[in-house]
Amino acid sequence: MATVLIVGRPNVGKSTLFNKLVKKKKAIVEDEEGVTRDPVQDTVEWYGKTFKLVDTCGVFDNPQDIISQKMKEVTLNMIREADLVLFVVDGKRGITKEDESLADFLRKSTVDTILVANKAENLREFEREVKPELYSLGFGEPIPVSAEHNINLDTLLETIIKKLEEKGLDLESKPEITDAIKVAIVGRPNVGKSTLFNAILNKERALVSPIPGTTRDPVDDEVFIDGRKYVFVDTAGLRRKSRVEPRTVEKYSNYRVVDSIEKADVVVIVLDATQGITRQDQRIAGLVERRGRASVVVFNKWDLVEHREKRYDEFTKLFREKLYFIDYSPLIFTSADKGWNIDRVIDAINLAYASYTTKVPSSAINSALQKVLAFTNLPRGLKIFFGLQVDIKPPTFLFFVNSIEKVKNPQKIFLRKLIRDYVFPFEGSPIFLKFKRSR
């Protein structure tokens, strides 16, 4: 699929333009400068033509900190790989030194570029005061738009399609491929999610730095491993709600993480092995379990743990005790920074997904039920007649009982254990239960 990149200095309205073109609110939009830190992508469909649109972080001329420097590096690397660039400038303020520096880089890269003057609500004022100086950037006729007010976006789309077709790129809409395993990578800030994400993808796609809170937007990318397609989502670190100010960019990012979990098949929960398992780790794992997603637990930064060769059992016990409610999850010890056990993470994802999509025959369920009930005492008056699996993603079982009110948590634990021990282990997947009254 053709790739179109939106670039420009901070706060010229790139994310607003992105959201309007993809027709959904995916990139975070705020008045705060430099809100977009990671590239965000989606598909644009327009009159039967499709292309991938990528919203990049604002390019600072002279980045003053490590985050800004990393943002610039990621964006400039993506420019070199793009089919077309939308160079966005401020149609009210005109050009700045930052615009001129980026224009110089774009010209040297020889990438096809469309100059977009955003915030040009007043076209007469734009034509008179701003447009003449834009020609000095060297990209020909600028296209004035107002993303916020939906002005001239059709003209922009027509120009994009024309440019891409002139390059001989196939823009025909194709049926969406839904056989990919969707994987969300979640965890507290600075546990190494982005480093793990990049180790799996083996390229600098997500922004990685040692400063907590670097990733704000979910970043997703496709990868084929041994012929299998995955879509990985690297999500912003979840912090405790009490530590997140309302109406902040970070608050929006936390909502986006929950949304990423909702859309995932398998969630990789990343823990910092140097810090053990915290209350917030437990909250995140609980969120994944309640949403009914398959899960893999990763102790990252294993290379920094002292005497690690003798401590596998200790950390496994810690996992079983503190994350007992997802103890069905595969547990992997990694150093994403050094590339340790990345293949095992992939294997665990495959195992969890296989469990998540497995359906077992009713005969196996009821055979196990009869066998175990023969030596099990149920609460007085409770009878379990038979059961069957009614769904996958997650595996969901319906049991027919004489009294739903008598089915308490111990009986639910008993039935889940019965299924895992006697029918199918469902390693990596939660098991949901439903009950129906029957005589």
Swiss-Prot record:
Domain KH-like: 358-439
Domain note: Each G (guanine nucleotide-binding) domain has activity on its own; domain 1 is twice as active as domain 2. The G domains do not interact, instead each contacts the C-terminal KH-like domain which lies between them.
Native source organism of the sequence: Thermotoga maritima (strain ATCC 43589 / DSM 3109 / JCM 10099 / NBRC 100826 / MSB8)
Originating gene: der
Effect of residue 118 to D: 10% of GTPase activity remains
InterPro entries according to UniProt: G_ENGA, GTP-bd, GTPase_Der, KH_dom-like, KH_dom-like_a/b, P-loop_NTPase, Small_GTP-bd
Protein name: GTPase Der
Domain of life: Bacteria
Keywords: GTP-binding, Nucleotide-binding, Repeat, Ribosome biogenesis
